[in-house]
Curated annotation (Swiss-Prot):
NCBIfam families: thrS. Binds 1 zinc ion per subunit. Residues 1-61 form the TGS domain. Transmembrane segments: none annotated. It comes from the Bacteria. SMART domains: tRNA_SAD (SM00863). Pfam families: HGTP_anticodon, TGS, tRNA-synt_2b, tRNA_SAD. It comes from Nitrosospira multiformis (strain ATCC 25196 / NCIMB 11849 / C 71). Residues 242-533 are annotated as: Catalytic. CDD domains: TGS_ThrRS (cd01667), ThrRS_anticodon (cd00860), ThrRS_core (cd00771). The gene is thrS. This is Threonine--tRNA ligase.
Amino acid sequence: MAVVRLPDGSERVYEHSVTVGEVAASIGAGLARAALAGKVNGKLVDLSARIENDSDVAIITEKDAEGLEIIRHSSAHLLAHAVKELFPEAQVTIGPVIEDGFYYDFSYKRPFTPEDLAAIEKRMAEISTRNLKVERQVWDRSEAINFFKNQGEHYKAQIIEAIPGDEDVSLYSQGNFTDLCRGPHVPATSRLKVFKLMKLAGAYWRGDSHNEMLQRIYGTAWTNKDDQNAYLRRLEEAEKRDHRKLGKQLGLFHLQEEAPGMVFWHPKGWVVWQQVEQYMRDIFRNNGYLEIRTPSVLDKGLWERSGHWENFRENMFVTQAEDREFSVKPMNCPGHVQVFKQGLKSYRDLPLRLAEFGSCHRNEPSGALHGIMRVRAFTQDDAHIFCTESQVQDEAVQFIDLLQKVYNDFGFNDILVKLSTRPAKRVGSEEQWDKAEEALRSALNHKNLIWELQPGEGAFYGPKIEFSLKDSIGRIWQCGTLQLDFSMPERLGAEFVAEDNSRQIPVMLHRAILGSLERFIGILIENHAGALPLWLSPDHAVVLNISEGQADYAREVTEELRRAGIRAYADLRNEKITYKIREHSLQKLPYQIIVGDKEVAAQRVAVRTRSGSDLGQMTLPALVDRLKEEIRTRAGAA
């Protein structure tokens, strides 16, 4: 007999063991038709999973987030099935769910083409209409390895060989296609109706450039056409906002092959950079941070003591000089500990907040680079707070206040928060972890924030809070971090004199608000579609004369604006005014100041915003006041 407890608190008693699908059918025919999978005692399982004992059971449908994930995972297998039917010699490797979709990696003798992609998608639709039953079986490990080797699927055999001995080897079959997977999957291929293949890319097997380059096919899958169409519209909008395209169009920066993952900032782009950096410098200065500067190249020995050499070596740029091995720093924390160690510190000196616009380099795989969003050379608004355990909560609260102010000033008001707690492998005592997690949890609750718990997702050296922004088209960008560290201060010999004269090790809080300045500027460009708020714009205004007769007055107006601290320039070219207006509108310039004979006679200017709004004539002092107020309040784009 099995007692099944449902999410609404009701119970159902079954005389014999029962499958999840049978539970759904006993509740109602409608639920049985809608069911995709189940959750038994918190674990996702197939509808065919058998319930032998008393259990908590939930039926998963497409209305559940897990339901959509199962649809996407099953769609990845549908993709692999279609590829094997069309290209029997292709080898399948892995096909996970990703944000908004899935991908599958294949090994094949020639590159897939866009025409292949269309044919594969068509075959996926055909397989869906066959309504093939999807069945799970647990296989003997050696039999599964031999099965895939006999099929010529050597990558699958490798994957099985790497599965821990205490885990089941589960295979899923639909028609004549069998794949390795933990599951769960939809019960039949007919449940997969809304999908689209998106693009092709390359990917190394196991992410190692020494291995074969595989072909990755990306796809998306949804529960209904409306959701898919909305997603495709978002993609179109994101394409228009692509910071790489806008960076070139607006003359902000460029990248080139001779310096992969490293940005060439142009004058206009560097103005934006300086505005962001100076804003953050003021934030540091006004909130008790001491700005420092540490070396970019440090001896291998320091990286060995910090643990980076063992855990991060493959991402570090290494060089040699005078028989010594050095690394360009991938992060700033070891250098900050060295500054803390200079001179004996007392508990009265804590908390000590050290900040740096730290220039870091990481040897990211070339395939992972993406404009200025994912680079090899970047600058962080980095800071480390050295404090006692009892100070952690107050420091966390102050940091959250600061982070919210910064994000609001940059126009981001929708912030997602996640707290990651102790992983299985960790340093520090249970008491330390209890105190640290409670301090961060209390700080979040003190600020009345809605936050998500991520059990076991903390770093081995301490729990952390992650802060993500939602942009104007609904995309999520993880930027801010507050990371507690029990390990590095001890590894690098940091200590302070406590009130009882004992030597103690400080807690170290790694914290960043923007993260990488390059990436954050990329986010700003895409969030505003290139039309940055006035205070961040490379130029605030351009002065346009209608004809040669107003050139001198246009120069005077430009000089007055510059003297008032407005970033302005004059366009005195002998072109039609409509041509000049259009050209500067495409450059997303916030204000166009137009002067003709009427404006010269009245000693006024005609003002137009980049959105096309005509503000009419106004005096120059009135215009200056308007611009200064907009800059002061960091108002949105004109």
